[in-house]
UniProtKB/Swiss-Prot annotation:
The protein, known as: Rab11 family-interacting protein 4
Coiled coil: 280-617
UniProt gene name: RAB11FIP4
Keywords: Calcium, Coiled coil, Cytoplasm, Cytoplasmic vesicle, Cytoskeleton, Endosome, Host-virus interaction, Membrane, Metal-binding, Transport
Coiled coil as UniProt keyword: yes
Organism: Homo sapiens
């Protein structure tokens, strides 16, 4: 048990080293994905070492040049630099996979151990099941003359004790459960039983052998006796000595059997891996098959060589105590065949071989028990590692789930905010669309009204144009008439001027005649002459005033004609511009469905300005008509 305790301490130290390496791996700054970058390791290495050492370190940690290092490669590289890479196989497999490497094989071994119905063992030795010392299977293996291949039976019988290990390792409470309690941590209390049970049982078996030799014979197969699996082996030497005593009592040539040697192994050299577990399980399965074959091929109720030898020894002791040796030989000669000596020699050899095989099997069973104990400790350590890994994985899973929940909540909040913004934007666009539709409807109604007003204005403008045309014709006729009147007036004026000139000359002639006639009476004629002179002067002034007024009248008429021509030309030019703008308004009415809001507003303002100018133009025309010829605007029925 000291070796097992030492062995269990080594993986614990190894696990502590792995946990420290985990802390170093975390401190080196691993990424969130669980990998450590080679550049990071190289940078840290250059702070504490040289270039060649850093390159060697990187080569150990990243032999495949992947550019990143996981924890398994990190541990393997560190242990490879230390020269103990093999010690890390099981630990890394548990660290990385989180499962027991040999877990699938152990239940099979347990079930097989529970099915074996052969002889039972306690600490490497056989426990008697009946008053007889040897079980029926060993007695069948040691039969003097078996008819079915004695060499095969002799070869299988030593391995029979090894096969029975599956059924022997267990507590009394584990008879129905096989080896299940041995590999489970909750059954540790059942592994170790008091050593007094096995010691008392061994002492009782030895005592019954010595005191009741005359009653020792084979009675076949009996009930199995449960034995403690992990108790010490105090009766190994006793049973070995019993075998030796039996051999020496049959023949004096049989020497003392050597004592069983106990080997203490170093716990660090007993590391058992999964491959060895598989080998041991395969070996146990093979031994179980061979045991079943041996039972099937062995004859029933045959007297074994050991029983026969013990009968001879009992007869010899009994005859020597009574002093009747001759009667004993006489009875032996009568009861036995002539070849009894050869059979006794053959039995001596077989007993010696069986003793040696028993010692070998005892050593093998001790080693297997020790390895089994180591495997149990190993399983317990691996279970603890699995629990640690499960706890770590659960914590990591909870942390990851919490991060994902936080990220999901953040995304949900962002999504809700974005949806609210989009809904507000959609609502705003819907309001703008509704407003634009209302504006378009209003603009359409205004455009229709403007079209109607434009149509009315066009009709009025057409009527006014017709009237203006009539007025222009009338104006032309009036101008022609005015010219004719001017010509007639000029002719009349010239005629009047000539008439005035003739009258002046006639007046002068009459004045001269009058003067001549009045010369005889000068007193009276002086006053009349002065009156005539004044009348003549006044007439001349009036004539000059008439001429001046006529000239001013001519000038005013010319100016009036010029102004009327200018007004007419300006009115015609403005009318042309307004008609062109009206044509543009008609094209705008066709484009109102495809135009934008700003364009519609600008076109509407321009149309209103054109309408205002048209109103002013019509007002001017009406005022001009009222000034010149109001009769045109009269309504004629």
């Amino acid at each position: 048990m000291a070796g097992g305790a030492g062995w269990s301490g080594a993986p614990a130290a190894l696990l502590r080293s792995v946990r420290r390496l985990r802390e170093v791996f975390e401190v080196c700054g691993r990424d969130p994905d669980g990998f450590l970058r080679v550049e990071r390791v190289a940078a840290l290495g250059l702070r504490f070492g040289q270039g060649e050492e850093v390159e060697k370190l990187v080569k150990y940690l990243d032999p495949n040049d992947l550019g990143r290092i996981n924890f398994k490669d990190f541990c393997r590289g560190v242990f490879a630099m230390k020269g103990c890479e093999e010690l890390l196989k099981d630990v890394l497999s548990v660290e990385s996979a989180g499962t027991l490497p040999c877990a699938p094989e152990i239940p099979d071994c347990v079930e097989q151990g529970s099915e074996v119905t052969g002889p039972t063992f306690a600490d490497g030795e056989l426990i008697p099941r009946e008053p007889g010392f040897f079980p029926e299977d060993e007695e069948e293996a040691m039969t003097l003359a078996p008819p079915e291949g004695p060499q095969e039976l002799y070869t299988d019988s030593p391995m029979e004790s090894t096969q029975s290990l599956e059924g022997s390792v267990g507590s009394p409470a584990e008879k129905d459960g096989g080896l299940g309690g041995l590999f489970l941590p909750e059954d540790k209390s059942l592994v170790h039983t008091p050593s007094m049970t096995t010691s008392d049982l061994s002492t009782h078996s030895t005592t019954s052998l010595i005191s009741n030799e005359e009653q020792f014979e084979d009675y076949g197969e009996g009930d199995d006796v449960d034995c403690a699996p992990s108790s010490p082996c105090p009766d190994d030497e006793t049973r070995t000595n019993v075998y030796s005593d039996l051999g020496s009592s049959v023949s004096s040539s049989a020497g003392q059997t050597p004592r069983k040697m106990r080997h203490v192994y170093n716990s660090e050299l007993l590391d058992v891996y999964c491959s060895q577990c598989c080998k041991k399980i395969n070996l146990l399965n093979d031994l179980e098959a061979r045991l079943k074959n041996l039972k099937a091929n062995s004859p029933n109720r045959k007297i074994s060589s050991t029983a026969f030898g013990r009968q001879l020894m009992h007869s010899s002791n009994f005859s020597s105590s009574n002093g009747s040796t001759e009667d004993l030989f006489r009875d032996s000669i009568d009861s036995c065949d002539n070849d009894i000596t050869e059979k006794v020699s053959f039995l001596e050899k077989k007993v010696t071989e069986l003793e040696n095989d028993s010692l070998t099997n005892g050593d093998l069973k001790s080693k297997l028990k020790q390895e089994n104990t180591q495997l149990v400790h190993r399983v317990h350590e691996l279970e603890e590692m699995v629990k640690d890994q499960e706890t770590t994985a659960e914590q990591a899973l909870e942390e990851e789930a919490r991060r994902h929940r936080e990220a999901y909540g953040k995304l949900e909040r962002e999504k809700a905010t974005e949806v609210e913004l989009l809904n507000a934007r959609v609502q705003q666009l819907e309001e703008e669309n509704t407003e634009l539709r209302t504006t378009v409807t209003r603009l359409k109604s205004q455009t229709e009204k403007l079209d109607e007003e434009r149509q009315r204005m066009s009709d009025r403008l057409e009527d006014t144009s017709l009237r203006l045309k009539d007025e222009m014709d009338l104006y032309k006729r009036m101008m022609d008439k005015l010219r004719q009147n001017r010509l007639e007036f000029q002719k009349e004026r010239e005629a009047t001027q000539e008439l005035i000139e003739d009258l002046r000359k006639e007046l002068e002639h009459l004045q001269m005649y009058k003067l001549d006639c009045e010369r005889p009476g000068r007193g009276r004629s002086a006053s009349s002459g002065l009156g005539e002179f004044n009348a003549r002067a006044r007439e001349v002034e009036l004539e000059h005033e008439v001429k001046r007024l006529k000239q001013e009248n001519y000038k005013l008429r010319d100016q009036n004609d010029d102004l009327n021509g200018q007004i007419l030309s300006l009115s015609l030019y403005e009318a042309k511009n307004l008609f062109a703008a009206q044509t543009k308004a008609q094209s705008l009415a066709a484009e109102i469905d495809t135009a934008s809001r700003d364009e519609l507003m600008e076109a509407l303002k321009e149309q209103e300005e054109i309408n205002f100018r048209l109103r002013q133009y019509m007002d001017k025309i009406i005022l001009a008509i009222l000034d010149h010829n109001p009769s045109i605007l009269e309504i004629k029925h």
